[in-house]
Amino acid sequence: MTLEPAAIAPVVNHPSLPLDDPGGLEISGEDAAAVAERVAREGLKVLAYRFDNDRWCTGQRFAAYRTLLGDTFDGRVLNAEAANTSPPPFFRDVVGCAHSVVTAHLVDQDGHPTMQARNEIIAFLAERLGTWAEEERGHDEPRASEPVPNPHASAP
């Protein structure tokens, strides 16, 4: 996705592929070089999350991302004890470990580590996309926080 010029706020959540190579990245060498070059050239930051005991998204995989992206890779690891202990059946029976930080294993409580991760992702996206929107919008266009006039609304 980061090869796509429109992707300006890359977030990697529990990347688990390839399944048979815990330290591998599911990307060709050519694409990996292009991603690393783009991230460096454009000053992008890549935000990533995983649980510490995740057997599908391992520390080896995060290390591979760090090797590829250097300091632009912000890999954050949550303690597996913070995961929702009652995930949906697929995650309980097939995945079998804390894996999906902001979905199946999210604990919807203020201040909880998984909610903090979710809030960090939202803040990252808002900051990155807000910066882009400021650069892209014309001076006569409303800000995102301003109501957008509806040209189809009838006059009062």
For the regions a language model picked out, list residue spans one by one.
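Short, functional N-terminal and low-complexity linear motifs
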Residues: 3, 32, 87-90
